[in-house]
Amino acid sequence: MGQTSSGRRDFLADRILGVAEFSHAHWFFGNLYEVLVKIPHRVAAAEASRELPRSPFGAGSPGRYYAPIAPINAPAAIAALVAGWNHADSRPWLLVAAASSTTGAAATAYLLRSINPDLFFSPQPLSETRRNPLLKRWYRVHAVRLAASAVALAAIHEARTLRLRSRG
């Protein structure tokens, strides 16, 4: 019975790691894309119209792409840590992944609550003098989020690789 329970736990840990790796890859590459093409500059300066409302899920808003998957990032990393706790070789990587994912989630929560409403969703675009300091802060916090998602993704990938090698 212990072997079956252990087998189920390993199966569950593998599945959770797969979900965590996918969701963190989505998060990292989405964050990278936002920086490279300066999505915040575009969305912050866009005038509201019938076709392009200034809303979290309006056309052009990254919210549409993150909403389905983003809420599972930190929970998946934490669940992977719990499910894989019995594997000493991958435990440190899972700890790093959970901590990094939680850091990224906290940075995201800060942006969503403190910066994004004024910067992106006010009825009209802010003046340049009001917009530029918010954009600067947004990019600084986003750098933390990008680094956290990269570290979490790399740690999850390493934990998954170690688990696969141990079956070898």
What is the meaning of each model-derived region?
Residues 143-160, 165:
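Terminal transmembrane helical module of multi-pass membrane proteins
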Residues 33, 82-89, 110-113, 158-168:
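Short hydrophobic alpha-helical membrane-entry/anchor segments
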Residues 10-25, 83-104:
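Interfacial segments of alpha-helical transmembrane regions
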Residues 67-81, 145-153:
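Core segments of transmembrane alpha-helices
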Residues 1-15, 163-168:
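Basic/polar N-terminal segments that are highly enriched at the extreme N-terminus
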